[in-house]
C-alpha cells in the first residue's frame, strides 16, 4: 500500500487529482482532504489551495465535525486561516 503525505501543496494536488479520478463527489472529497489538512498540515498553502478550489469547511463528516472543529481540537494554528478565508 502506497503512503500519501499531505504536508505540501504538491502532495495535496496529487491526492485531489486521484480522488477526482475515482469519480466521487468532488466537493465532498475536497472537504475530507481539508479535514485532514486541518489536523496534520503544518503549512498554509494546502489549505488555501483547497479553499480556492471550493472545499467546504462547513461540510461535516460522520462524526459531525467540520474543519473548524478539527483545527480547534488539535490546536492547529491554521484554524485562524480557515476562519479568515471564510469571512473574507
Which sequence ranges carry the predicted segments?
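Short, positively charged, low-complexity/disordered linker segments
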Residues: 31-54
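Ankyrin repeat A-helix N-terminal signature
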Residues: 2-10, 36-43, 70-77
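Ankyrin repeat domain, specifically the short helix-to-loop turn at the C-terminus of the second helix
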Residues: 14-22, 48-56, 84-88
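Substrate-binding/catalytic groove segments of enzymes
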Residues: 44, 59-60
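N-terminal cationic amphipathic segment used for targeting or macromolecule association
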Residues: 14, 22-23, 29, 53, ...
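Ankyrin-repeat boundary/"N-cap" motif
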Residues: 1-5, 25-37, 60-66
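Leucine-rich solenoid repeat scaffolds
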Residues: 60-88
Amino acid at each position: 500500500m502506497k503512503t500519501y503525505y499531505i504536508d505540501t501543496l504538491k502532495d495535496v494536488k496529487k491526492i485531489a487529482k486521484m480522488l477526482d479520478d475515482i469519480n466521487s463527489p468532488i466537493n465532498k472529497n475536497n472537504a475530507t482532504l481539508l479535514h485532514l489538512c486541518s489536523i496534520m498540515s503544518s503549512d498554509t498553502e494546502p489549505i488555501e489551495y483547497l479553499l480556492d478550489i471550493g472545499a467546504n469547511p462547513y461540510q461535516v463528516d460522520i462524526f459531525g465535525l467540520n474543519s473548524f472543529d478539527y483545527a480547534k481540537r488539535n490546536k492547529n494554528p491554521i484554524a485562524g486561516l480557515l476562519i479568515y478565508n471564510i469571512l473574507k
